[in-house]
Amino acid sequence: FSLDDTVKSMQINTYELIDGEWHIVAGGGGQAFEDAEGRLALGFDNLADGLRIAIQSEHNNGSTSYFKESENDITGMGYATSVLSDKQEIVYDQEIPLVIQIITSKNEVHSYVVDYFFQPEEYEKYDYEYVYAITVLFSQKPVSELAN
């Protein structure tokens, strides 16, 4: 990703779609980030079980992960994952959807581009058991001023 020198922080959030609304399951805090360029890598099989995040930039290298005992029984379910594949304009303080993952026992899955994060009702139409999303947000505010 490429930013300007006014960036102060970044936030990576994982959501689960519940009753037509996105509910945060991990993230919400943020971290100081003041480099104009960097790389973000995400590692996961299914988002119900967790996520690994790695960030690399001129002054910032690190990784973090969260894994949880899933309350959701996904045994035998299939999943479809959509990822952001094109360059995206970064607008400060606006979430950018990176990944949408549908986990379901249904035989047919309608997968959408990640921009459908902003239209969760599309996923509700098909009554999938689980839908998850990962977003990133860059801000000119320090971490202490980010909304949680």
What do these predicted regions represent?
Residues 63-102:
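Intrinsically disordered, low-complexity segments enriched in Gly and acidic/Ser/Thr residues
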Residues 94-148:
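Glycine-rich, aromatic-bearing surface loops/beta-hairpins
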Residues 4-78:
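Structured domain cores in non-transmembrane regions
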Residues 33-45, 86, 90, 123-126, ...:
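Acidic, Ser/Thr/Pro
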